[in-house]
């Protein structure tokens, strides 16, 4: 997990004095974490030569949209929403119950953000520009104990939404209207694992891939599931785990490609009291 971070740190020290103890070192290398602040459950995409990221905002209304040229240095460019128009938020009675584990996607010329709150269900919004304006939040489904949604649009035009159940999984996939404003069925369970959550859906060639964390925040690992059918059955491989480092529970993040064909993984590490800081792995 942290071999690359360690190597970049040593490379930075060998070439010039370390600028900071984290992030961009000013000489073409970086040291994890790249964001030494509370950005839990990051999801990121590339659009053209720019990268965009969102993260959970448990108790600070707005959900930040971040932009980067290099996956290391990030700038705040907008707030995805200003308020959740439900009574408990108006009365300051929903601490830590805001937006959990959002998904960010670019489809049909628009940026799409989906998220759940633990007791209010599924919300979504869109914008044609990452700087906004963002459409008012649409409350897709009022339901308890959903988490970690991710939309996916297949080549045949069918849209889907993957999600899990608060605290323990499993992974469930629904058919969804193409505009993202309605779920079309009750969903099908496609995978059950230990605290399976954080679903991110991709398709490469003829295979559907689900990238999920398992095992819980403190001691978990990252799993990739693969199938030729979005409903499975899925084959499974653990692709990232703690190993012998102090970087506990590599957890819940996003796979993103670069214009020249490299692949990188952004994930969080719980590091209290700071919160959940963001790491970047090749």
List where the protein language model places each region.
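Bacterial Sec-dependent N-terminal signal peptides
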Residues: 1-16
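Carbohydrate-active catalytic/glycan-binding domains of CAZyme proteins
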Residues: 14-282
């Amino acid at each position: 997990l942290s071999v690359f971070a360690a190597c970049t740190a040593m490379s930075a020290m060998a070439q010039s004095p370390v600028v900071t103890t984290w992030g961009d070192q000013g000489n073409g290398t970086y040291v994890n974490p790249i964001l030494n602040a509370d950005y839990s459950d990051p999801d990121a995409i590339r659009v053209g030569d720019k990268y965009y990221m969102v993260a959970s905002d448990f108790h600070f209304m707005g959900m930040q949209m971040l932009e980067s040229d290099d996956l290391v240095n990030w700038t705040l460019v907008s707030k995805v929403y200003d308020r959740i128009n439900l009574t408990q938020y108006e009365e300051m009675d929903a601490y830590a119950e805001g937006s959990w584990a959002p998904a960010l996607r670019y489809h049909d010329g628009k940026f799409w953000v989906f998220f759940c709150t633990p007791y209010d269900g599924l919300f979504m919004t869109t914008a044609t520009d990452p700087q906004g304006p963002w459409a008012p939040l649409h409350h897709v489904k009022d339901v308890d104990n959903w988490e970690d949604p991710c939309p996916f649009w297949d080549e045949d035009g069918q849209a889907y939404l993957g999600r899990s159940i608060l605290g323990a999984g499993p992974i469930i996939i629904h058919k969804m209207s193409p505009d993202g404003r309605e779920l079309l069925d009750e969903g099908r369970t496609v995978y059950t694992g230990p605290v399976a959550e954080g679903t991110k859906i991709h398709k490469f060639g003829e295979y559907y891939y689900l990238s999920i964390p398992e095992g819980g925040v403190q001691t978990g690992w990252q799993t990739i599931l693969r199938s030729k059918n979005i409903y499975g059955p899925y084959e499974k491989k653990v692709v990232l785990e703690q190993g012998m480092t102090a970087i506990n529970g590599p957890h819940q993040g996003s796979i993103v490609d670069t214009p020249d064909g490299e692949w990188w993984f952004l994930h969080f590490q719980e590091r209290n009291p700071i919160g959940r800081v963001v790491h970047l792995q090749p």
